Amino acid sequence: MIDYRGWRHTFKLDPDKTIDDEALEAICESGTDAIIVGGTYGVTYDNTLELMSRLRRYAVPAVLEISSLDAVVPGFDSYLIPLVLNAGDPDWIFAPHVSGLQAFGAYIHWDEIITEGYIIANPEAGVAQLTKARPIADATQAKAYAQVATNICRLPIVYMEYSGTYGDPTIVKAAKTGAGEAHLFYGGGIRNPEQAAEMAAIADTVVVGNVIYDDLDAALATVKAVKGTQY
């Protein structure tokens, strides 16, 4: 199994977005700890396979965060399986996982599977709309959701997902407290090294995504910012 507990920084690439070879090389050779592949809309088998085949040129670990059963591609180093803890649509908590096991259970290498408890904190995000995510009312509730993930569901990762907007450090700190021994990922809205460093002081792993496609230099600068931050 991939040792995600050593990750401080990861980039997240969306198969439905375009990235040229030069930019991809810069991302993969940046010193980031891993590349996560995943997205909410437009993720297909073909575009996931195409991105995976390009990533295989590099030594950096590549993991697939599964959001669609139609886009499960073999060949990644590991697979992240999200459970959306605050999904308002209960079908997004366990129903996709049951369907996935019915379809692929005989082929799964369980040592390649890592489960995540997602807390979606941006109600305007596409993933929030898709799952009808319940808003996070305050820090106390964020902590409680994280406690559900680690103490009730026994999930190894808690993922605070702000998806496109920069998060409230108070909320993220509360989730970190609630996560206990679980590993806290933070993702959402990081546009510069300063924001990356602020979240790196709280979370175990900082995930940088959209800025890759808007400002590559700023994205690359987040690696040093995160890895130079104590937490």
From Swiss-Prot:
Cofactor(s) of this protein: Mg(2+)
Presence of keyword Transport: no
Catalytic activity: sn-glycerol 1-phosphate + all-trans-heptaprenyl diphosphate = 3-heptaprenyl-sn-glycero-1-phosphate + diphosphate
Residue stretches spanning the membrane: none
EC number: 2.5.1.n9
Top EC class of this enzyme: transferase
CDD domains: PcrB_like (cd02812)
Pfam families linked: PcrB
Keywords: Lipid biosynthesis, Lipid metabolism, Magnesium, Metal-binding, Phospholipid biosynthesis, Phospholipid metabolism, Transferase
Keyword RNA-binding: no
Biological or metabolic pathway of the protein: Membrane lipid metabolism; glycerophospholipid metabolism
Residues given in the record as sn-glycerol 1-phosphate binding sites: 12, 159-164, 189, 209-210
Signal peptide feature range: none
Residue sites binding Mg(2+) per the record: 14, 40
GO MF term list: heptaprenylglyceryl phosphate synthase activity; magnesium ion binding
Primary role: Prenyltransferase that catalyzes in vivo the transfer of the heptaprenyl moiety of heptaprenyl pyrophosphate (HepPP; 35 carbon atoms) to the C3 hydroxyl of sn-glycerol-1-phosphate (G1P), producing heptaprenylglyceryl phosphate (HepGP). This reaction is an ether-bond-formation step in the biosynthesis of archaea-type G1P-based membrane lipids found in Bacillales.
Quaternary structure and interacting proteins, as annotated: Homodimer.
Protein name: Heptaprenylglyceryl phosphate synthase
Lineage: Bacteria, Bacillati, Bacillota, Bacilli, Bacillales
Gene name in the database record: pcrB
